[in-house]
Amino acid sequence: IKSIMSDFPSFYSMVYYQYSKAVNIFLSDVIKDFLPNANQDMSYELGIFLDNIEYGEGYALKQLKKRIPVRHVIKFCDIMESRLKGYDNISQMTYLKNELDDMRVHTLEEELDKRKQKNERTQLVLIIILTTYIIVYYYFQVISAMKLFSL
């Protein structure tokens, strides 16, 4: 589910922009456009969704809700089901898009913090190695100078 949720904001963003431009969009077409960009788990779930869509979009959305019981996916399915009933819910779609964008930003910030910590550890190790090298180098320089002047 974690890998699906990492890809879901991109998928929803694509759905949002398609539906905000035109009303007569088939969800299956949007999914087919997204599949080449999806990760393995997301493509698997969307593939099942496309198989279920043969029985109707409403059925496919209900099955998706059952397979991925995550708040954002459930909200997405509810929004799409209400669109099928003829309601214009761009404001709800926009709200969910903003929520998913915030989630994506939060995820990216966490990733950035992890990378910073890893970078700081690597820098510390490199500084220790360099300091050790400098100490050993100057130690041998001093020993060499002492031998030179003791003759």
Predicted regions and their residues:
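Hydrophobic alpha-helical transmembrane segments in multi-pass membrane proteins
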Residues: 41, 74-75, 125, 129
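Hydrophobic alpha-helical segments characteristic of transmembrane helices
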Residues: 10-31, 63, 70-110
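Juxtamembrane/interface alpha-helical elements of multi-pass membrane proteins
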Residues: 1-51
